């Protein structure tokens, strides 16, 4: 490990160590599969896979005679076909068999048949948090989606409440503020008046509806109150006699009051609009929206005079026809259907989270009911009305209390739920069979739906992604990513600005910096460093508890909901050893407001300044001195750094480098403390101190030069010697882009900030030749080429060195089997695997058939179908793999074997490669200058790199200057620094270091021109900057074509490097040539170089023969236009001067010749 000097304003030690950075993946999958509990034979919790089985079983037959019951499941871990390494080699999936113990019970006879039933295979997670599917490492990204529960929001003039279940129908209530009516919508179908909906649910009288939502007051009817009564609403119906019936909810008129007085009604019950305050837990309302709806009912159903209430049939008919238009209706069915939509566990599930949110919102303690209750519906309506009246506030949809995270485990649980419901259906069908008594449990279960669902999820789901494996940081960040897209999430086009924006609840939970720059900005984010996901799927972040103004060491994890309205101090607030704050006013935040307050009001305090950003951003020193846009680019570009052959950790780090290396999974860590007894390049053996016997040893296999998903090189190197003592958890071997157990993505270079002869104009970079010679930025890239050997209709294909019409020079590189030898240097066009395919016999002449029968098979024709090195690729063959049917049982039908050849290429830094620092300062290498021509310092040291000073002011990433100043001091003092984010070294500290190292405190030096030896006119800022080489290499982008493939219909050259395509000559290029009057050039480009088929052949022929040429034919695109017009029924033909038809196709030519 490297000794680092802590240089910053804060304390070097943190109260809380960083958690394991990939625990979001590991914990989620462990919750799903509960492997640890299965191994230790402990009882399983009702979550993940266990909960799926418990919910589906028992499956009972229609008549109730037979039941299939679930006992337990287990994973056959010992029967794994391949190890992780073999899976990658052979293109297999790393998975185990899932078996379920089922009991088939015959309730009539009491007989029970038990069987362990095969339930398909289930992919296992590696210790690095990845899955290996078909030989490639994949990551299942966590999804952030809208939490189930209830939300209240406003769109234009509509106030809405929405109850979102985990599974089932959405229920929406909306108040139209122009008309003062309240409607309900189920699954976004037609609106239904709220009172009708309530009647359908059982509030069948006007009185019931009114007493549910309104406070009721009793008023004496007498001369004194006579004037106050008109205009008020009755809460209880009054029946004086046959034709004098006053309904609840009707407005009282002066005439009514007279009638009351005359008929001896002394007391009436009225709606009390002022008594809306919470009375013993009831939530009464103060607006007449519900009463308006009752009035609207009358208009909707023309009630016959004298009828007191709406008939149930009319209500059900109205509600049911809105929900299920066009379906036949019977009243009992209608009632049942409506009840099952929300109140049956089979059709509706709020989920734990939905119930938790509802209870939290309305102040209940119930956390178990998974379906809706009448109380939930009433409370939601009341709350919406209170918001409409202005007594309560709307919800913020983008608040992290309304968004939750679904990780691997939960996503897989949902996949299994869907598949198991299909299994259940099939089992029930099979149970209804007459011969059910002869059945065994395994005959009832169909595995197909499960296998296909799991396969489809891992292979094609938007959330199961090919792992970004450019370097360890890219790997780590990919596993910590949160994605708002995917099934059940948002879509790019419909996501507005608000969803993408930074919200105050993101503090400590999601990084405000790290997100892509393109159309996905803000939809794909990263987890903050200390953040974790709680049981409900909400993001939590840790805080130190502050009691009576004193900071304690007690830690609490708070979700966004818990944190609301709490007063939280920053991590760098000063306090003494007793925890007393030193200032009288401390900077705090309360929800989204930043203010100051006295220590006694503080509830919590941040645990660390880097709490609010992600791992990538926490690797940028002096982050707080950079503009946010550049910090974003810096975070993103560190993930694109190519692992180098000789990387070095940065002189100026942030302290996160060792944490990232440790948790990334690319280094080898000691499992137990002990002594190293063997250390070779490929293997380390440690004898643990607490070894039970002489054979109890820890063996570690070192990975050498393997290919990653992105064709970079995965190579581990040993850090320990034989006889060395190692501690548990100590890093004993480095991985790619790590050095001495620290992340090392690039190298430290001596920098001059100076324009140099225009070579570093516009972000271009000038580099010294020394860097190339010393291989500071040399990386190895490994490409895989594979070929299948198939069984064809005409016979099998063969791998052989005996290939027709191929020169001996090329065949010399192949071994006796026709496969390239390991260690051979190959160039484009070389054969890697010789393969011949039988040719179809087609129209063989009788003479040829005679020859075949005389000389046997020899004369049979074969076609050369060898695997060749594609254009633009060269390198050394480092490995060849042959995978046959004996090795793996599941090769595709018709495939006999697969051959894979690995070609490695050492790539030095060259002009056109992209480089970047950690502050978003990116550029392309424009010139590599000999060392002697580079500007040099007074002591003769030449610079390594020159950057343009104009790259700094407008970009506002001052961090790069501070880093290079401190780096310069560190290089000459032989020190490495930890400069934590948000607590960086001050200018005074940096200047102090520069003075100690013997430099000018401004780090400006006199530079000398390498060409003339003269000093430059002004002093130049000099420093040591950490630069990375990015995965945008010029070798992968350079491309040239002379002739190549053509598009089938238009016969024009294809486009793009992957298709070996040509350059497109677009409209603007044509205009330019027209403007020059370059007629012949233009004609050639638009015809023979593009899509004039006969012209292409003729011109090639003429060039070969050396004949001057001017061929012009008809371009194929003209023929396409002709055929399209003919498709419209317009026959178009062309005639020459003499009136003869010009043939456009060979077929036409034949027809003309015949006629």
Curated annotation (Swiss-Prot):
Its EC number is 2.7.7.6. GO terms for cellular component: DNA-directed RNA polymerase complex. Gene3D superfamilies: 2.40.50.100, 2.40.50.150, 3.90.1100.10, DNA-directed RNA polymerase, beta subunit, external 1 domain (2.30.150.10), DNA-directed RNA polymerase, subunit 2, domain 6 (2.40.270.10), RNA polymerase alpha subunit dimerisation domain (3.90.1800.10), RNA polymerase Rpb2, domain 2 (3.90.1110.10). SUPFAM superfamilies: beta and beta-prime subunits of DNA dependent RNA-polymerase. Keywords: DNA-directed RNA polymerase, Nucleotidyltransferase, Transcription, Transferase. GO terms for molecular function: DNA binding; DNA-directed RNA polymerase activity; ribonucleoside binding. InterPro entries: DNA-dir_RNA_pol_bsu_ext_1_sf, DNA-dir_RNA_pol_bsu_external_1, DNA-dir_RNA_pol_su2, DNA-dir_RNAP_su2_dom, DNA-dir_RNAP_su2_hyb_sf, RNA_pol_bsu_bac, RNA_pol_bsu_CS, RNA_pol_bsu_protrusion. It catalyses: RNA(n) + a ribonucleoside 5'-triphosphate = RNA(n+1) + diphosphate. GO terms for biological process: DNA-templated transcription. It is an enzyme of class 2 (transferase). PROSITE patterns: RNA_POL_BETA. The keyword Nucleotidyltransferase applies. The keyword Glycosyltransferase does not apply. DNA-dependent RNA polymerase catalyzes the transcription of DNA into RNA using the four ribonucleoside triphosphates as substrates. The RNAP catalytic core consists of 2 alpha, 1 beta, 1 beta' and 1 omega subunit. When a sigma factor is associated with the core the holoenzyme is formed, which can initiate transcription. PANTHER family: DNA-DIRECTED RNA POLYMERASE I SUBUNIT 2. Belongs to the RNA polymerase beta chain family. HAMAP family: RNApol_bact_RpoB. This is DNA-directed RNA polymerase subunit beta. It comes from Borreliella burgdorferi (strain ZS7) (Borrelia burgdorferi). The gene is rpoB.
């Amino acid at each position: 490990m490297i000794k680092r000097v802590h240089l910053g304003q804060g304390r070097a030690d943190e109260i809380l160590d960083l958690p394991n950075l990939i625990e979001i993946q590991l914990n989620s999958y462990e919750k799903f599969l509960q492997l640890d509990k299965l191994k230790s034979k402990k009882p399983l919790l009702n979550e993940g896979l266990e909960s799926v089985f418990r919910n589906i079983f028992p499956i009972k037959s229609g008549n109730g005679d037979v039941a299939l019951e679930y006992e337990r499941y287990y994973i056959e871990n010992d029967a794994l076909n391949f190890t992780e390494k073999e899976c990658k080699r052979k293109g297999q999936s790393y998975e185990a068999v899932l078996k379920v113990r089922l009991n088939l019970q015959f309730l009539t006879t009491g007989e029970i048949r038990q069987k362990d039933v095969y339930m398909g295979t289930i992919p296992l997670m590696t210790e690095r948090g990845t899955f290996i599917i078909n030989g490639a490492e994949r990551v299942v990204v966590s999804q952030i989606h809208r939490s189930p529960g209830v939300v209240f929001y406003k769109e234009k003039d509509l106030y809405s409440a929405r109850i979102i279940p985990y599974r089932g129908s959405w229920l929406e209530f909306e108040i139209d503020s122009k008309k003062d009516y309240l409607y309900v919508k189920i699954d976004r179908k037609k609106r239904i008046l709220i009172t009708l909906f309530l009647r359908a649910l059982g509030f069948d009288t006007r009185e019931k509806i009114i007493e549910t939502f309104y406070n009721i007051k009793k008023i004496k009817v007498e001369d004194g109150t006579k004037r106050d009564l008109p205009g008020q609403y009755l809460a209880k119906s009054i029946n004086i006699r046959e034709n004098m019936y006053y309904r609840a909810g009707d407005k009282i008129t002066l005439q009514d009051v007279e009638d009351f007085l005359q008929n001896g009604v002394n007391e009436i019950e009225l709606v009390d609009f002022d008594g809306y305050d919470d009375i013993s837990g009831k939530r009464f309302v103060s607006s007449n929206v519900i009463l308006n709806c009752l009035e609207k009912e009358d208009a909707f159903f023309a009630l016959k005079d004298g009828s007191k209430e709406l008939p149930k049939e009319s209500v059900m008919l109205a509600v049911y026809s809105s929900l299920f238009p066009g379906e036949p209706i019977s009243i009992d069915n209608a009632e049942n259907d409506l009840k099952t939509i929300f109140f049956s566990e089979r059709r509706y599930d709020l989920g734990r989270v939905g119930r938790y949110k509802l209870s939290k919102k309305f102040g209940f303690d119930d956390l178990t009911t998974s379906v809706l209750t009448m109380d939930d519906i009433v409370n939601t309506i009341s709350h919406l009305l209170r918001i409409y009246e202005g007594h309560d506030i709307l919800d913020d949809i983008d608040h992290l209390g309304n968004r939750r995270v679904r990780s691997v485990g939960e996503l897989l649980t949902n996949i299994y739920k869907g598949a198991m419901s299909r299994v259940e259906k099939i089992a029930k069908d099979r149970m209804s069979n007459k011969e059910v008594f002869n059945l065994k449990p395994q005959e009832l279960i169909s595995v197909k739906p499960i296998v296909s669902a799991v396969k489809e999820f891992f292979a094609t789901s938007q959330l199961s992604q090919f792992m970004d494996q450019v370097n360890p940081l890219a790997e780590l960040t990919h596993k910590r990513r949160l994605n708002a897209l995917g099934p059940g999430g948002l879509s790019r086009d419909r996501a507005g600005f608000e969803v993408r924006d930074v919200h105050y609840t993101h503090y400590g939970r999601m990084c405000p910096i790290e997100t892509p720059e393109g159309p996905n900005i803000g939809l794909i984010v990263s987890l903050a460093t200390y953040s974790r996901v709680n049981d409900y799927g909400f993001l939590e972040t840790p805080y130190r508890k502050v009691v009576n103004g004193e900071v304690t060491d007690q830690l609490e994890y708070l979700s966004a909901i818990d944190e609301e309205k709490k007063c939280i101090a920053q991590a760098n607030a000063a306090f003494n050893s007793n925890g007393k704050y030193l200032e009288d006013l401390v900077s705090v935040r309360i929800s989204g407001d930043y203010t100051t307050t006295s220590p006694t009001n503080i509830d919590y305090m941040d645990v660390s300044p880097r709490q609010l950003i992600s791992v990538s951003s926490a690797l940028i020193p002096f982050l707080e001195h950079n503009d946010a846009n550049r910090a974003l680019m810096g975070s993103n570009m560190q993930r694109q750094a190519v692992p180098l052959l000789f990387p070095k950790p940065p002189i100026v780090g942030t302290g996160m480098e060792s944490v990232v290396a440790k948790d990334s999974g690319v280094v080898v860590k000691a499992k137990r403390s002990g002594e190293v007894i063997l250390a070779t390049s490929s293997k380390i053996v440690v004898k643990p101190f607490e070894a039970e016997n002489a054979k109890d040893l820890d063996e570690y296999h070192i990975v050498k030069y393997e290919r990653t998903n992105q064709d970079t090189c995965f190579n581990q190197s040993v850090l320990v010697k034989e006889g060395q003592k190692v501690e548990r958890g100590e890093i004993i071997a480095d991985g790619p882009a790590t050095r001495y157990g620290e992340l090392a993505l690039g190298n430290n270079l001596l920098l001059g900030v100076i324009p140099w002869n225009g070579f570093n104009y516009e972000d271009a970079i000038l580099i010294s030749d020394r860097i190339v010679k010393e291989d500071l930025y040399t990386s190895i890239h490994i490409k895989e080429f594979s070929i299948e050997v198939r069984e064809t209709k005409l016979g099998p294909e063969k791998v052989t060195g005996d290939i027709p019409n191929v020169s001996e020079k090329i065949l010399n590189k192949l071994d006796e089997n026709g496969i390239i030898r390991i260690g051979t240097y190959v160039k484009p066009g070389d054969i890697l695997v010789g393969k011949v395919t039988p040719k179809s016999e087609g129209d063989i002449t009788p003479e040829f058939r005679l020859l075949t029968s005389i000389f046997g098979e020899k004369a049979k024709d074969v076609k050369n179908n060898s695997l060749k090195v594609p254009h633009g690729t060269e390198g050394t063959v480092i490995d060849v793999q042959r995978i046959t049917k004996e090795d793996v049982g599941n090769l595709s039908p018709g495939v006999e074997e697969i051959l894979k050849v690995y070609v490695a290429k050492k790539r030095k830094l060259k002009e056109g490669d992209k480089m970047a620092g950690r502050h978003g300062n990116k550029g392309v290498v424009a010139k590599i200058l000999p060392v002697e021509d580079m500007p040099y310092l007074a002591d003769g040291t030449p610079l390594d790199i020159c950057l343009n000073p104009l790259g700094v002011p407008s970009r506002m990433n001052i961090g790069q200057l501070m880093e290079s100043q401190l780096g310069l001091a560190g290089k000459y003092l032989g020190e490495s620094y930890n400069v934590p984010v948000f607590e960086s070294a001050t200018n005074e500290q940096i200047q102090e270091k520069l003075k100690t190292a013997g430099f000018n405190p401004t780090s400006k030096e006199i530079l000398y021109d390498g060409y003339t030896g003269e000093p430059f006119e002004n002093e130049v800022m000099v420093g040591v900057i950490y630069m990375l080489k990015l995965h945008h290499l010029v070798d992968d982008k350079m491309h040239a074509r002379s002739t190549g493939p053509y598009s089938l219909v238009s016969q024009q050259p294809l486009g793009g490097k992957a298709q070996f395509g040509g350059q497109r000559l677009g409209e603007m290029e044509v205009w330019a040539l027209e403007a020059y009057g370059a007629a012949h050039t233009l004609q050639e480009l638009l015809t023979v170089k593009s899509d004039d088929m006969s012209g292409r052949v003729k011109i090639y022929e003429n060039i070969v023969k050396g004949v001057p040429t001017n061929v012009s034919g008809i371009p194929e695109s003209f023929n396409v236009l002709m055929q399209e017009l003919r498709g419209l029924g317009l026959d178009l033909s062309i005639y020459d001067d003499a009136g003869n038809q010009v043939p456009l196709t060979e077929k036409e030519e034949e027809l003309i010749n015949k006629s």
